[in-house]
UniProtKB/Swiss-Prot annotation:
Family, as annotated: Belongs to the radical SAM superfamily. Biotin synthase family.
A GO MF term: iron ion binding
InterPro entries in UniProt: Aldolase_TIM, BATS_dom, Biotin_synth/BioAB, Biotin_synthase, Elp3/MiaA/NifB-like_rSAM, rSAM
Name of this protein: Biotin synthase
Family matches, as SUPFAM superfamilies: Radical SAM enzymes (SSF102114)
Organism: Caulobacter vibrioides (strain NA1000 / CB15N) (Caulobacter crescentus)
Length: 341
């Protein structure tokens, strides 16, 4: 394996990424922390909120997702929210300390008929002074350009897992289709938000495969969310994890964060779904290993996040501060409810 440096590379081999995972834990975290400090203030954490603007009824069969129409999870499908309601949630998120506001819709792909309403939402949220992000399923090249023109800064489209395990997660969308959407986003001039989920029954080689894919993209993701599976009853992967009682090992989760930081040194590595189930000590280790972004707001889709008081106390105890330093960790009581990327 080549010497670990803080300089971005796009020529990582899968063997090199696997070798990073195999480093002694203390050495891996040390190297990741060094890379992190070369590009970021380790005491600064970015705060984001992600609102579900259209929940449930998705045609995809992603085996972890409560929003899939293929599974009976008790989730009620809703129509696309009105722009005024979305803007009100965004304003509350901004006033509560969020720097980025993400809008998510449970669609396989964006339909042109929904573009006018979405571009209106994006423009009005942008006018609040927030960074804007959306996750709306697959995009065409023209749709990506329209979203960019409306003021969208970031587009989220996760790879979910490594290519070899992907068929065990979803069969209604190909890996290449995900890569194609990311290419449309880049070509339109938007920043990419792309990561995956761990704890779905995959092996370490699959986690390495995911990070290898991300590290060898033409441009590293600007934001790299790492989600820990929150098993939801009624979903195939959730039921499997619940029945077997097997969650990803906490140390292995930190390893994943550390490797992500090393192979994508300038990306914002985000602790996403699953943070509610993490101890304070585990979150601290993740921050030490290079995570520097979290979701706030109390809820991610159908799964909980730590409350405002918990996050405020965690930041105080770890001497952390919101990125930019001008916003509060505490969210107001009416802060927007948020949904998972």
């Amino acid at each position: 394996m080549s010497e670990i440096t803080a300089s971005p590379r796009h020529d990582w081999t899968l063997a090199e990424v696997e070798a990073l995972f195999a480093l002694p834990f203390m050495e891996l975290v040390f190297q990741a922390a060094n890379v992190h400090r070369a590009h970021f203030d380790p005491s600064e954490i970015q705060l984001s909120q992600l609102l579900s603007v259209k929940t449930g009824g998705c045609a995809e069969n992603c085996g972890y997702c409560s929003q899939s129409a293929h599974f009976k999870t008790g989730l009620k499908a809703d129509k696309l929210m009105a722009a005024d309601d979305v803007v009100a949630k965004a304003r509350a998120a901004r006033d509560g300390g969020a720097q980025r506001f993400c809008m998510g819709a449970a669609w396989r792909e964006l339909k042109d008929r929904d573009l006018p309403k979405l571009t209106e939402m994006i423009g009005e949220v942008k006018a609040l002074g927030l960074e804007t992000c959306a996750t709306l399923g697959m995009l065409t090249a023209d749709q990506a350009k329209a979203l960019k023109a409306a003021g969208l800064d970031y587009y989220n489209h996760n790879l979910d897992t490594g290519p070899d395990y992907y068929k065990d997660v979803v069969t209604t969308r190909t890996y290449q289709e995900r890569l194609d959407t990311l290419a449309h986003v880049r070509d339109a001039g938007m920043s990419t938000c792309c990561g995956g989920i761990v704890g779905m029954g995959e092996q370490r080689r699959d986690r390495a495969g995911l990070l290898h894919q991300l590290a060898t993209l033409p441009a590293h993701p600007d934001s790299l969310p790492i989600n820990g599976l929150v098993p939801i009853s009624g979903t195939p992967l959730g039921d499997k994890v619940l029945s077997e009682g097997k969650a990803i090992d906490a140390i292995e989760f930190v390893r994943t964060i550390a490797v992500a930081r090393i192979v994508c040194p300038k990306s914002m590595v985000r602790l996403s779904a699953g943070r509610e189930g993490m101890s304070r000590e585990l979150q601290a280790l993740c921050f030490m290993a290079g995570a520097n972004s979290i979701f706030v707001g109390g809820k991610l889709l159908t799964t909980p996040l730590p409350g405002q008081d918990e996050d405020s106390q965690l930041f105080q105890d770890l001497d952390l501060k919101p990125m930019g330093g001008a916003v509060r960790v505490e969210a107001k009581a009416d802060a927007a409810m948020v949904a998972a990327e």
